[in-house]
């Protein structure tokens, strides 16, 4: 796809035209030369592509080196013209040139009509200059539209033109406006635009691939739009600031969160440490009495004391705090001991005079008795007086009502009154045991028939197992697979992993007990009676020896103790208390009751009962009783044809049975074994490498330590203060004669 080779720079272009500098005195013919050049570039591009008709490209403004947004110097006066030009540039970027909508009409109207400033400016001369510039600009635009607009034949569109969704919405909103007004708006737009307005032709439906240069240009345009929007907001803010304080603008400012310390109720219960408690203030008790009146008069309030706002502050220290001089702890401790505590300082009257004193209105009062609290300290009397107790007893006597009982006539009869005798219960009647075994015996005896029935032969059904499968032939044993052995002698002695054949779990066969013959009587097997012999424990002798030693020790202790004499009390001879004489009863002769006799009688009774049971069983077995004939009522036996699949059929099977070669299984096992061995070997190598690295690090550390200790470091040469030879300031000694000689006297 052919593209026009255009150049661009990363920085914003500076070849722009400042429309504010244009005056009516300058040459108006060369004003639109820059726009003509850009239009010629676009026409050349269309001719290269082979389009004869005037065609407005989709990306003409994007490819052109057009400055869309520019920065103007700030002025105190409301410059409405700059705002209009910025709005036009923004709308040109957002809306294509071939798209004619209601927004373009609004822009053309706003461009033709001067916008009145919202607030009245102070500088009237600047406003007049601005109006003059706007009039000149309107005249230049009209001249450009007359000169540059060329007549062009409108080509009928080949297909129905598509209308964007935004355009449809705007047309629906403005549907109430007449069609004539829309035509007028379009004509004014074409006049205002000049050469940029070309009759719309439907563009060719082909996908436009944007190059990196075009994408960069679009990005640059978006950034310029953002800059223009920010400039517009800044100018609005500047206007509000210059207008002065008007109506307060409500701003949704979030309040700064103030930190509040936690206040737990449990902290008040904890007793504080004596160091943290408040300082003790010595107060004279007598001087405090009647100092404060019980009902103080409400005085007039003084002036409001100005206090600073409690705003949130950062914890960072300020410059003044940081610049404070450092005081050692020793000096602080010494100053603390020398300083007099605050409780011993007298109050300064000057400070008290500065504070606003509360004016107290003095009112004459009558003397009143003091409100003493001692009478409220007395406890309530809980003990009742005698009068209260007598009143309570009188109430109880009045509430009590006497009820007489009926007269018992037996009182007048002769003889003592005895309680009624309890009714005598009848003696217990013995009831025999109702055993279940006796019931069964009676039932059997009642069911017995007096006459023996004749024996009749009944045939039994043929066993079906003979027809279903082979009976009596053992199953074929599965021979294990042959383990191949290599003929190589080196491999014969190789240790092989023993292969364990998976033993199939054989189902547990429950064999039923054989049915006893009807003619043979049943004899229960009685278990042999074995008497357990009681053997003495092994430590009986040891216990006996301990008992003897204990008794011997007790006797020795008794011999060592000296017996103390204790006199018995004097007996009372008034009454003689003799023990009662015990009279022994006459011996009554009773027969012997030996255990052997009891056991013999019990055994004889059991033997007799057992014989009776055996005789009954023999009689029951001798009486043959045939079972009812149920075979004649059942369906005849029909052997079922077995439905075996082709895979299970040993002969002529079509499906191949799955099998697994022993070599494949051994190969898999070998691979797994080699994999495990390789993992173990890699782990060992990793461990050895880690140990080697640790040893190397230890050696390096040891060498560094030895070098640090062994290498001698010479101390630097000391620099002493230079000796300054100062000349003596004393005057020279003047020689004076001692005058020892007396010749000159």
Curated annotation (Swiss-Prot):
GO terms for molecular function: importin-alpha family protein binding; molecular adaptor activity; protein kinase binding. Keywords: Acetylation, Apoptosis, Cell cycle, Cell division, Cytoplasm, Cytoskeleton, Isopeptide bond, Microtubule, Mitosis, Nucleus, Phosphoprotein, Ubl conjugation. Belongs to the TPX2 family. One of its GO terms (cellular component) is intercellular bridge. PANTHER family: TARGETING PROTEIN FOR XKLP2. The modification Phosphoserine is found at residues 121, 125, 294, 312, 359, 486, 737. The modification N6-acetyllysine is found at residues 128, 307, 375. This is Targeting protein for Xklp2. It is found in: Nucleus; Cytoplasm, Cytoskeleton, Spindle; Cytoplasm, Cytoskeleton, Spindle pole. Spindle assembly factor required for normal assembly of mitotic spindles. Required for normal assembly of microtubules during apoptosis. Required for chromatin and/or kinetochore dependent microtubule nucleation. Mediates AURKA localization to spindle microtubules. Activates AURKA by promoting its autophosphorylation at 'Thr-288' and protects this residue against dephosphorylation. TPX2 is inactivated upon binding to importin-alpha. Residues 91-101, 110-119 have a biased composition (Polar residues). There is a cross-link at residues 477, 500, 640, 739 (Glycyl lysine isopeptide (Lys-Gly) (interchain with G-Cter in SUMO2)). InterPro entries: Aurora-A-bd, TPX2_C, TPX2_central_dom, TPX2_fam. Residues 84-217 are annotated as: Disordered. The lineage of its organism: Eukaryota, Metazoa, Chordata, Craniata, Vertebrata. Residues 126-137, 182-192, 204-217 have a biased composition (Basic and acidic residues). Interacts with AURKA. Interacts with importin-alpha; leading to inactivate TPX2. Interacts with HNRNPU; this interaction recruits HNRNPU to spindle microtubules (MTs). Interacts with BCL2L10. Interacts with KIF11. One of its GO terms (biological process) is mitotic spindle assembly. The modification Phosphothreonine is found at residues 72, 340, 369.
């Amino acid at each position: 796809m052919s593209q026009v080779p255009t150049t661009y720079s990363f920085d914003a272009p500076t070849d722009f035209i400042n429309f504010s500098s244009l005056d009516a005195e300058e040459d108006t013919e060369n004003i639109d030369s820059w726009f003509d050049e850009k239009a010629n570039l676009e026409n050349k591009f269309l001719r290269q592509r082979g389009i004869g008709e005037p065609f407005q490209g989709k990306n003409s403004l994007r490819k052109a080196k057009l400055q869309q947004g520019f920065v103007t110097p700030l002025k105190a006066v409301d410059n409405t013209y700059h705002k209009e030009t910025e709005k036009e540039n923004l709308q040109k970027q957002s809306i294509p040139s071939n798209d004619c909508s209601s927004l373009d009409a609004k822009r053309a109207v706003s461009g033709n009509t001067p916008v009145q400033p919202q607030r009245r400016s102070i500088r009237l001369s600047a406003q007049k200059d601005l109006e003059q510039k706007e009039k000149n600009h309107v005249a230049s635009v009209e001249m450009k539209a007359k000169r540059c607009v060329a007549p062009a034949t409108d080509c009928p569109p080949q297909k129905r033109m598509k209308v964007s969704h935004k355009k449809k919405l705007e047309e629906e909103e403005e549907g109430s406006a007449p069609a004539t007004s829309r035509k007028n708006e379009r004509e004014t737009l074409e006049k205002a635009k000049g050469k940029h307005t070309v009759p719309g032709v439907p563009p060719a439906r082909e996908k436009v691939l944007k190059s990196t240069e075009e994408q960069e240009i679009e990005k640059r345009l978006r950034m310029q739009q953002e800059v223009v929007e920010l400039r517009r907001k800044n100018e609005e803010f500047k206007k509000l600031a210059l207008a002065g304080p008007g109506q307060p603008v409500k701003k949704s400012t979030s309040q700064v969160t103030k930190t509040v310390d936690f206040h737990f109720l449990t902290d008040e219960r904890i007793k504080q440490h004596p160091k943290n408690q408040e300082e003790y203030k010595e107060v004279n008790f007598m001087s405090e009495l009647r100092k404060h009146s019980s009902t103080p008069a409400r005085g007039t309030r003084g002036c409001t004391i100005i206090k600073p706002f409690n705003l949130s502050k950062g914890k960072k220290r300020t410059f003044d705090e940081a610049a404070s001089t450092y005081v050692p702890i020793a000096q602080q401790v010494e100053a603390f001991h020398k300083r007099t505590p605050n409780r011993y300082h007298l109050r300064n009257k000057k400070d008290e005079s500065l504070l606003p004193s509360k004016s107290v209105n003095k009112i004459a009062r009558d003397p009143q008795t003091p409100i003493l609290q001692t009478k409220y300290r007395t406890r309530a009397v809980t003990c009742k007086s005698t009068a209260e107790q007598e009143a309570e007893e009188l109430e109880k006597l009045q509430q009590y009502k006497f009820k007489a009982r009926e007269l018992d006539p037996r009182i007048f009869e002769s003889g003592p009154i005895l309680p009624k005798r309890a009714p005598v219960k009848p003696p217990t009647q013995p009831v025999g045991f109702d055993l279940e075994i006796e019931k069964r015996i009676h039932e059997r005896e009642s069911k017995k028939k007096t006459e023996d029935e004749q024996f009749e032969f009944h045939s039994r059904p043929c066993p079906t197992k003979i027809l279903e499968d082979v009976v009596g032939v053992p199953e074929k044993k599965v021979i294990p697979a042959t383990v191949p052995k290599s003929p190589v002698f080196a491999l014969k002695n190789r240790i092989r992993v023993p292969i364990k054949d998976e033993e199939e779990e054989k189902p547990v066969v429950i064999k039923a007990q054989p049915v006893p013959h009807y003619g043979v009587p049943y004899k229960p097997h009685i278990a042999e009676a074995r008497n357990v012999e009681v053997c003495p424990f092994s430590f009986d002798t040891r216990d006996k020896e301990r008992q003897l030693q204990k008794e011997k020790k007790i006797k020795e202790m008794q011999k060592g103790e000296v017996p103390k004499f204790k006199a018995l009390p004097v007996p009372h001879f008034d009454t003689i208390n003799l023990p009662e004489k015990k009279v022994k009863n006459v011996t009554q002769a009773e027969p012997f009751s030996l255990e052997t006799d009891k056991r013999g009688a019990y055994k004889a009774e059991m033997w007799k009962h057992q014989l009776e049971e055996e005789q009954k069983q023999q009689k029951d077995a001798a009486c043959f009783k045939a079972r009812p004939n149920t075979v004649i009522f059942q369906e005849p036996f029909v052997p079922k044809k077995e439905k075996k699949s082709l895979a299970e059929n040993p002969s002529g099977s079509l499906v191949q049975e799955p099998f697994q070669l022993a070599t494949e299984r051994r190969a898999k096992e070998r691979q797994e074994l080699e994999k495990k061995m390789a993992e173990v070997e890699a782990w060992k190598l990793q461990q050895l490498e880690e140990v080697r690295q640790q040893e190397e690090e230890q050696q390096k550390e040891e060498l560094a330590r030895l070098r640090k200790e062994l290498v001698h470091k010479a101390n630097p040469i000391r620099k002493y203060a230079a000796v300054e030879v100062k000349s003596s300031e004393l005057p020279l000694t003047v020689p004076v004669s001692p005058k020892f000689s007396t010749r000159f006297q």
